[in-house]
Amino acid sequence: RLASIQSGYARPALAAGKTRFVLYNRSGNELRVESRTQNLYSKTLENSIYLCAMSDTGTLAVATDSADSTARLTVYTPTMSEQLHWDMTGTQGTPVRMAFAADSRRLAVAAVTSSAGQLQANLFVLSLAQGDPVQLSSGDSVPQWLGWLNNDTVLAVYENCAVVYG
């Protein structure tokens, strides 16, 4: 046993990379970045956390509630400096799945919204160098799992099929 962590969070969740993980409070505003043996960073955000993703290189993506947009996705460097943020519109949706490419240069984001009273799921790829999201798909099925097959290919597993995007 390397460590034992007592978060005290009401709705704890975890996202892991190769050498660190983030433990966060869903619907709360606190997160902790941990290595195998110690706390690296603790952060209290202004808004409630929806979802986090950790890359293999320690880059952290945090999707939060926002007063100015539907959701705010903030990407932090391994030293917890803000690298970029994306204020997601009502048309783009609220993130429900996120996954970093193995090289940590891009982030796949599945988001949900409603259009004409119907559920709509949107899939985006966000380049961390440019910060501009590119929409890969839009449909009525929400990905149950999202990941990268390589640095250029995203796999989305839906309820009744799996789709590869290049």
Identify the role of each PLM range:
Residues G8-R11, R26, E34-L40, N47-S48:
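Short acidic/polar, Gly/Pro-enriched loop/turn segments located at secondary-structure boundaries
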Residues L40-Y41, I49-D56, L60-A63, S69-T70, ...:
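Glycine- and small hydrophobic-enriched segments that form the cores of compact globular domains
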Residues E34, E46, S55, A63-T64, ...:
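A structural detector for beta-sheet-dominated domains
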Residues L2-Q6, T37-T44, E82-M88, G131-S138:
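A short beta-strand motif characteristic of beta-propeller blades
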Residues N29-T37, T70-L84, G117-Q135, N160-G166:
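Beta-propeller blade-edge and WD-like acidic-aromatic loop motif
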Residues P95-Q135, W145-G147:
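Loop-centered beta-sheet repeat module
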Residues S7-T19, N47-D56, Q92-F100, G139-D152:
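Repeated scaffold domains used in trafficking and secretory/extracellular systems
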Residues R1, L14-R26, L31-R32, C52, ...:
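Short beta-strand elements that form the blades of beta-propeller/WD-repeat-like
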